[in-house]
Amino acid sequence: MIKSTNIQAIGSGIMHQINNVYSLTPLSLPMELTPSCNEFYLKTWSEWEKNGTPGEQRNIAFNRLKICLQNQEAELNLSELDLKTLPDLPPQITTLEIRKNLLTHLPDLPPMLKVIHAQFNQLESLPALPETLEELNAGDNKIKELPFLPENLTHLRVHNNRLHILPLLPPELKLLVVSGNRLDSIPPFPDKLEGLALANNFIEQLPELPFSMNRAVLMNNNLTTLPESVLRLAQNAFVNVAGNPLSGHTMRTLQQITTGPDYSGPQIFFSMGNSATISAPEHSLADAVTAWFPENKQSDVSQIWHAFEHEEHANTFSAFLDRLSDTVSARNTSGFREQVAAWLEKLSASAELRQQSFAVAADATESCEDRVALTWNNLRKTLLVHQASEGLFDNDTGALLSLGREMFRLEILEDIARDKVRTLHFVDEIEVYLAFQTMLAEKLQLSTAVKEMRFYGVSGVTANDLRTAEAMVRSREENEFTDWFSLWGPWHAVLKRTEADRWAQAEEQKYEMLENEYSQRVADRLKASGLSGDADAEREAGAQVMRETEQQIYRQLTDEVLALRLSENGSNHIA
């Protein structure tokens, strides 16, 4: 029950006194503050506002605090105000939003608080948490240790902090997000836990997973084994253990069980190779690049690439080159080193291409050899698309069409690989994507694909999958390619440069449609589906109408230009 104790304006802070005033049972309701107490809050907050530092938006915070108190509002939002400290908080609030500030600590928390969103601050610790708390998000801070967790807590997000240990987890917890910390162990999981994110820690052993769990993200830890309970999770559950040094015995056991005819457990994602990353290069950027060139060129190449050492993702790109030299293709494919050297020369001459390539390589953080090989495929695609956009094929429509066909085929193979991944229970998705590209490289004339991969045997891609994929690519190419090509960015770049008048006419036609027909066509579509007035449906319908219009206009333009150019070259089709 609520005790009627006088609030005195002395002591360590109002909230400490309020916590003494409100001795609450779960069914208690907060007592309205007296006018004198309100006045004390306002006076305290006014002093706090005056003592702010440059950059803090304490004036906005003061107004929100005042309104919250006067209206007895349950939610207080002080997010994104660059606040470095908080004053005592209104005692009646149940939700506190303080995201994206500069806070290093928090005051005592209101006794009825249920939700705290305090992510993206500089918090080093948290105060005692009220027993009523149900949701805590304090991700992206500097917290080293958590206080006792209330029994009613259901959602805990403390990712990207500096935690070395976790307290006992409360029995009602349904979501635990602790990725990006320094944990090497984890307490037992509550029976009601449904979601777990534990990636990028140092965990060596997992507790048993409760049957209620439907999603467990465990990437990049030090796990060599998994508890047997992982196989007893529901069929629609998802477990990701990529980037862990699972033992050979564990891998074989998982593969044997998950491929059995009676398996009805979760889908488990893994990765071949160990858990090391290539984010830390063995050599400087210049040294990693020059290693691909003959000795008589290395001095000049090194001087050129020294200038790029501080560009974004340069370190990751350097590490990628180190790993690329250790792939099957680098060891076995004739002319591979010369191909890489020629590509690096093109990168040194184009800042835009270099920036794009560095960004693509930044995704290849896993040390798995086939992950590096797939990234090399993507870098080759980036180069060719860049060259097409910059004009290399302006006078060679046949070569541009061939490149377009290859990009189209690769897109379809990615769709097929994505569908295949969904059917597998124990899967390294990188191996699946690479398998379709590598094994069909010759039949589909994929110049950007490596011709060998190391771990095809664990991809789960069968000979029948490959035959079906080839047939699907050819069928879709026959029916869809010209429409796809007419919307392809590099083709548009060619048209703008070489067919400026025709391109301008097409753009004018598109804008006339937008002015005269667009609104009515969207309205008609919404009316036909009974969704008039639905904002989400309107956005979707608008995008569909725009795409259909562009498809019609650009397809007509494409047909005209290709008919002219191909007839000049003695061809009457776009094959």
Curated annotation (Swiss-Prot):
Protein modification: Ubiquitinated in the presence of host E1 ubiquitin-activating enzyme, E2 ubiquitin-conjugating enzyme and ubiquitin.
UniProt superkingdom: Bacteria
Entry-linked InterPro entries: Leu-rich_rpt (IPR001611), LRR-bact_E3_ubiq_ligases (IPR051071), LRR_dom_sf (IPR032675), LRR_E3_ligase_N (IPR032674), NEL_dom (IPR029487)
Keyword flag Repeat: yes
LRR-type repeats, residues: 69-90, 91-115, 117-130, 131-150, 151-170, 171-195, 197-209, 210-233
Gene Ontology CC terms, in alphabetical order: extracellular region; host cell cytoplasm
Entry's Gene Ontology BP terms: protein ubiquitination; symbiont-mediated suppression of host NF-kappaB cascade
Residue ranges, annotated region (E3 ubiquitin-protein ligase catalytic domain): 282-575
Region (Linker): 271-281
Family classification: Belongs to the LRR-containing bacterial E3 ligase family.
Subunit and partners: Interacts with human RBCK1/HOIL-1 and RNF31/HOIP components of the LUBAC complex.
Domain notes: The LRR (leucine-rich repeat) domain forms a slightly curved solenoid and may mediate interaction with target proteins.
Name of the protein described by the UniProt record: E3 ubiquitin-protein ligase IpaH1.4
Chain's gene name: ipaH1.4
